[in-house]
A protein has these predicted regions:
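Conserved mixed alpha/beta catalytic, RNA-binding, or beta-rich assembly cores of soluble enzyme
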Residues: 2-42, 51-354
Length: 354
């Protein structure tokens, strides 16, 4: 391949199937070096899926861990109101199972569509009626369940904080002083609590990796790779990529953040000009090499901060880690590809420096 013609490349890297206690840093470093024949480049970006990190480092809670937390902090034999859960077998069913096991009765407020776009009944991809599904989960624990098909945020007010669990994924901060949120439950094990957790088995959930653990992890991977190769790469842990399905309308963002840990070179946002806008407007009279030279000159001499400048209109000035997280999540997939590590190359290059 002629790298003078290649821009950003995103490549999935195979890794062994890890279990708790496996030496994940060694495995990540060795997998990257094997895949690249030890030919890393400065500013390559290495992404590791949050699941790989959490599973290998034992970031789990059991259903009974959650039950114990609820009964200690909310009380025994309570009627617990569950407000606006996500509609997901993977993300919420096990949490609801624990709530039902801990409570006397459960009331669930369920709006037509959940926070990330899943519909309550006749889901377009799973075919599930989540009212029936969630009610069955509660009943299977021997607990009474009442479903209210409304947005609970508009209806609950006052009362005892220990009666309500607010299940919002991204607006929970505004309710933390009023109700228990998913971020509160079992947050002694992870600073995100149950936010971003996944079903691991019928009695266990995998937690989203904590901020401190994640930061230590990415910095150690970066150091190891630099020690071996002399190359300075960037490293991040990524979860859901935040892209939105245009057909189902589902927002792929059931985690609390896209990246719980990343090296300092990934701070910031792109600072770009719109090439086609310059080609069609300012340099409409140029062609060929003269047009190319003019555009390269614009890129090389652009302001260091184009925020609010019309030259940057339409250039997607979002955070690097959010943009890269989307790219990595789509590259690695969520099923059986077996590539939980992603290498992104040339991400920080532009038209002027290939």
């Amino acid at each position: 391949m002629n790298e003078n013609y290649l821009g950003t490349m995103s490549m999935g890297i195979k890794a062994p199937i890890l279990k708790e206690g496996d030496p994940i840093i060694d495995i990540v470093v060795n997998s990257v070096l094997e895949a690249t024949n030890n030919q890393l480049k400065d500013k390559d970006v290495i992404g590791i899926t949050e699941s790989l990190v959490a599973r290998s480092l034992g970031e789990y809670v059991t259903i009974d861990d959650i039950v114990n937390w609820i009964q200690i902090y909310m009380g025994f034999e309570k009627t617990i109101t569950v407000v606006n859960p996500i509609y997901s077998r993977n993300r919420f069913a096990m949490i609801l199972k624990a709530i039902a096991r801990a409570a006397k009765d459960v009331i669930i407020y369920m709006p037509d569509v959940d926070e990330v776009g899943n519909v309550r009944e006749n889901h377009p991809f799973t075919g599930l009626d989540y009212c029936k599904y969630y009610k069955q989960i509660v009943n299977d624990e021997g607990t009474f369940c009442k479903i209210i098909k409304k947005d609970g945020r508009k209806l609950i007010s006052g009362g005892d904080k220990t009666d309500v669990i607010y299940c919002g994924l991204h607006d929970y901060e505004q309710y933390k002083n009023t109700y228990i949120t998913l971020s509160d439950i079992c947050n002694d094990k992870c600073d995100f609590g149950l936010l971003g957790s996944n079903k691991s088995s019928e009695e266990k959930l995998k937690l989203f990796p904590s901020s401190k653990l994640s930061q230590n992890f990415v910095e150690e991977v970066q150091k190891r790779l630099n020690d071996i190769t002399g190359v300075n790469v960037e490293v991040m842990i990524y979860g859901d990529g935040c892209f939105k399905d245009p057909i189902g309308g589902i927002w792929e963002f059931a985690d609390p953040v896209v990246s719980p840990g990343f090296t300092k070179g990934l701070n910031g946002t792109p600072n770009e000009i719109k090439i086609k806008a310059f080609a069609d407007d300012k340099y409409d009279n140029l062609n060929g090499d003269k047009l190319t030279d003019a555009i390269i000159n614009e890129i090389q001499n652009k302001q260091s901060d184009l925020k609010g400048n019309m030259n940057s209109q339409g250039t997607t000035p979002r955070r690097y880690v959010d943009l890269l997280g989307s790219l990595m999540d789509l590259t690695s997939g969520s099923g059986d590809k077996g590539t939980p590590i992603v290498l992104v190359r040339n991400y920080f290059k532009n038209f002027s420096n290939f």
